[in-house]
Amino acid sequence: MAGGQRRSARHTYPAAVLRLLAVASVLLLAACGSPATHNSADVTFAQGMVPHHEQALEMSGLVPSRTENPRLIDLAKRIADAQKPEIDRMNGWLRTWNAPVQASSHGHTESHGMVELGNLADLDGTEFDRQWLSLMIQHHRGAVDMARKHLSAGTDPETRKLAQDVVSHQEKEIAEMESLLPQG
């Protein structure tokens, strides 16, 4: 019997060590976690671009009631349709990163590439079209500048992809808006 007990202890000892090593490995991996893919530039980009996009939504919301230009109405709708989900994505990243989600900035300041809307809501027709296009061109240029700055410093792949998309899409929209800008 004594030999049988020793034999059983010899067999359980390696199994116990293996179990202990497995538990230690799991704990070690959990403690290490996956490396952060974002940095402060990614957080700053998302925090700045959210209110910037919100201002574009505000501006786009004015278009249907201020102009009858179907091309401008279509452009404003496309801008809003593209930027609404981007706002949601950026706010999601900020929550995931435990970073403050900035309060909506309807102060219309020049910060973060924002533009001064002035009396835009009081205009209509061709006067509105000209002012809206001029402001949205300026607004888009601010977004492109923010995105390019981010590309030089950001590390998160998803955030960098969004910044690249902002540059390519908004540069195309700037060209479109310049072609729509009434002369004179």
Q: Model regions: which residues?
A:
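All-alpha RGS (Regulator of G-protein Signaling) helical domain and cognate RGS-like helical scaffolds
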Residues: 33-184
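Bacterial N-terminal signal peptides that target proteins for export
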Residues: 4-22
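C-terminal motif of bacterial Sec signal peptides marking the signal peptidase cleavage site
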Residues: 28-31
